[in-house]
Amino acid sequence: MAKVHRLMNAVLRLAAAAAAATAAVVMVTSRETTSFFGIQMEAKYSYTPSFIFFVVAYAVAAAYSLLVLAVPAGSALSRLALTTDVVLGMVLAGAVASAGAISDIAKNGNSHAGWLPVCGQIHAYCNHVMAALIAGFVALAVHFVVVMYSLHIVTDVICPCH
C-alpha cells in the first residue's frame, strides 16, 4: 500500500509541477506591441505587479512540487510539507485571483474609475494572459488534490483507523 501512496503522490505532484510551470511560462511569454492612434504601445507581463506575483508564485510552486518528491512519506518532514502545501495553495489562489482581477480590468475597464478597456487593442496579449490564467486555475485545482491526498496519507500514518 505504501508503494501505491508513493506512486500516486509522485504522479499528483508531477502534474501539479507541470501545470504550475506551464502557467508561469505562458504568462512570461505574453507580449505584444501595437500602435494606438499613432502611439507605439507595448504590453508585457512584467509591467504589471500582479502578473509578476503570478509568475513568481507559480514558478515557486513548480519547483517546490518537484523538491517535495524527495520527502519520505510518513516522516515528520512530510507533515511540514503538508503545512507548506496548504500555505502554497493560499499563495497560488491569491496569485491567480490578483492576476484575474487585473485581466478583468484590462478586458472590461472600469467605468466608475474612468479606466478604459485595453484588450481591444492588444488581442494576442490578452488571449495569452487568459491562457496563463486557465493554466493557473488548473494548477491550483491539481494542487488542491495534492493537499487532500497528502492530508489523507498523513492522517493514515497518525491514526490507521481503517
UniProtKB/Swiss-Prot annotation:
A matching Pfam family: CASP_dom
Segments traversing the membrane: 8-28, 51-71, 86-106, 129-149
Keyword Cell membrane appears in the UniProt entry: yes
UniProt membrane topology term: Multi-pass membrane protein
Any single GO BP term: response to auxin
Keyword Nucleotide-binding among record annotations: no
Cytoplasmic-facing ranges: 1-7, 72-85, 150-162
Main subcellular localisation: membrane
Tissue and organ expression note: Mainly expressed in roots and leaf sheaths. Detected in shoot apical meristem, organ primordia, including branch root primordia, and vascular tissues.
UniProt GO cellular component terms: plasma membrane
Keyword entries, A-Z: Cell membrane, Developmental protein, Membrane, Transmembrane, Transmembrane helix
Signal peptide positions (record): none
Topological region Extracellular: 29-50, 107-128
Induction field: By brassinolide (BL) and auxin (IAA), synergistically.
InterPro entries: CASP/CASPL, CASP_dom, CASPL
Intracellular or extracellular location(s): Cell membrane
UniProt similarity note: Belongs to the Casparian strip membrane proteins (CASP) family.
Quaternary data: Homodimer and heterodimers.
Function recorded in the entry: Involved in cell elongation in rice through dual regulation by brassinolide and auxin.
Protein name (Swiss-Prot/TrEMBL): CASP-like protein BLE3
Organism: Oryza sativa subsp. japonica
